[in-house]
């Protein structure tokens, strides 16, 4: 029951955020005359894009258990970490750590800039996580995540 209330609360927060003046119009975030460009087709199943404070975009290749990043300055993709616990959704906290939903063993991870990982939790409300999927971190470092039953 507490899990249902947590999910409803999260959805309510998401709805409030999406209807607030903080949401950008797509015309404001997509540069005029922008062109879609294929950066790479070497991945199996990508997930969880998140931008670091430098503008690099990190993403997971979940079946291959790796995290990569696209360096916006060089336009090259580099491997950041392998053996990620089959990371899915990602988000950067205010200290520059990459948080991941690592669903292989139902865990939420924190990975520092050097690629050193720490398991933050494997449970919520006394129950083991099923398969964390996506997450978001608020300005007070509160972590919100989805944990669906597949």
Regions inferred by a protein language model and the residue ranges of each:
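Positively charged n-region of N-terminal signal peptides that target proteins for export
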Residues: 1-5
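Bacterial N-terminal signal peptides
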Residues: 6-17
